[in-house]
Amino acid sequence: MSFDEFADVSEAQVTRAIAKDWGNEFIDRVDTEVIIVGGGPSGLVTAKELAERGVDVTIVEKNNYLGGGFWLGGFLMNKVTVRDPAQSVLDELDVPYEESDEASGLYVADGPHAVSSLIKSACDAGAEVQNMTEFTDVVTRENHRVGGIVLNWTPVHALPRELTCVDPVAVESDLVVDSTGHDAVVISKLSERGVLNAPGIEHANEHNTGMDNTADDEYGAPGHDSPGHDSMWVSRSEDQVVEHTGVVHPGVVATGMAVATVEGLPRMGPTFGAMLLSGKRGAQACLNELGREATPIDFTPAAPADD
């Protein structure tokens, strides 16, 4: 069978098409309702829930890919776990899973299937993505209320300082969500400025450990650990992360592992139920702060009735 030719398009036309569409979208997103810093599982859930309710949402992600650590379930194994009742989120995403024979209420799914479905659902809902873009600071208003973020291209940070004198730019928003995981970069910046008391970060500073500043290519790189949170305790950590999710500073909501770092909570390791439900609770906190009338977000689904 013969193949019909592709459309006759020049290289310049391809470049203009990319640049025009990207530029128009970026200009449209310079002033938005909610900026979510970090495109891991909690940030993606927050973005999905808000976008489904008509909120203008932009995800700012420093990597070229979304999903954070949700691609793998620990030790380079690509099976992820959630504990009851977080499997309800997998149901919403049509992600298949099985109950483990290790414990009742422990469910296992394929990481790539789960994270790709979550990314698709957030994008389908209308969330916009600015990837390869790094948070560098916050935009502040009266009484240190956060009114946006300062950002730059991720590669700028990777180049030697003597080669890069590249000013960042600022974008405005009604709310900023810190979904940056262990590093809690938005809240860490506010703590550094002395305008927010974060127990976990303060504890790290008092004990002279500080937050993790190792380079991305060094052992102990950001994202692997943080002295802001406590050591692993799965059963306690997940409940507390969801419980403490919400507004942490005027204009700022924290979700996911950023909550553990801010509050000094235990880490939970490779189980993701708290990330998913924290994302839902964070979205509801945003709706409340925005004063939006919308269908409430159920982050504590009831157990199904017995047949």
From Swiss-Prot:
User: What terms describe the molecular function in GO for this protein?
Assistant: cysteine-dependent adenosine diphosphate thiazole synthase activity; iron ion binding
Write out the PTM section of this UniProt entry.
During the catalytic reaction, a sulfide is transferred from Cys-165 to a reaction intermediate, generating a dehydroalanine residue.
Query: Is Iron among this UniProt entry's keywords?
Result: yes
Q: Name the positions where glycine binds.
A: 267
Alphabetic keyword roster: Iron, Metal-binding, NAD, Thiamine biosynthesis, Transferase
Q: Where is this region: Disordered?
A: 202-232
Q: In which pathway does it act?
A: Cofactor biosynthesis; thiamine diphosphate biosynthesis
Q: At which positions is NAD(+) bound?
A: 42, 61-62, 69, 167, 257
Keyword Metal-binding carried by entry: yes
Q: What is its EC number?
A: 2.4.2.60
Its BP terms in the Gene Ontology are: thiamine biosynthetic process; thiamine diphosphate biosynthetic process; thiazole biosynthetic process
User: What Gene3D superfamilies does UniProt report for this protein, alphabetically?
Assistant: FAD/NAD(P)-binding domain
- The record lists Fe cation as bound by 167, 182
Q: Which reaction does it catalyse?
A: [ADP-thiazole synthase]-L-cysteine + glycine + NAD(+) = [ADP-thiazole synthase]-dehydroalanine + ADP-5-ethyl-4-methylthiazole-2-carboxylate + nicotinamide + 3 H2O + 2 H(+)
2,3-didehydroalanine (Cys) occurs at 165
Q: What class of enzyme is it?
A: transferase
State the family named in the UniProt similarity comment for this chain.
Belongs to the THI4 family.
Record's subunit section = Homooctamer; tetramer of dimers.
Its job: Involved in biosynthesis of the thiamine precursor thiazole. Catalyzes the conversion of NAD and glycine to adenosine diphosphate 5-(2-hydroxyethyl)-4-methylthiazole-2-carboxylic acid (ADT), an adenylated thiazole intermediate. The reaction includes an iron-dependent sulfide transfer from a conserved cysteine residue of the protein to a thiazole intermediate. The enzyme can only undergo a single turnover, which suggests it is a suicide enzyme.
Under what name is this protein listed?
Thiamine thiazole synthase
Name the source organism. Answer: Haloquadratum walsbyi (strain DSM 16790 / HBSQ001)
Name the lineage.
Answer: Archaea, Methanobacteriati, Methanobacteriota, Stenosarchaea group, Halobacteria
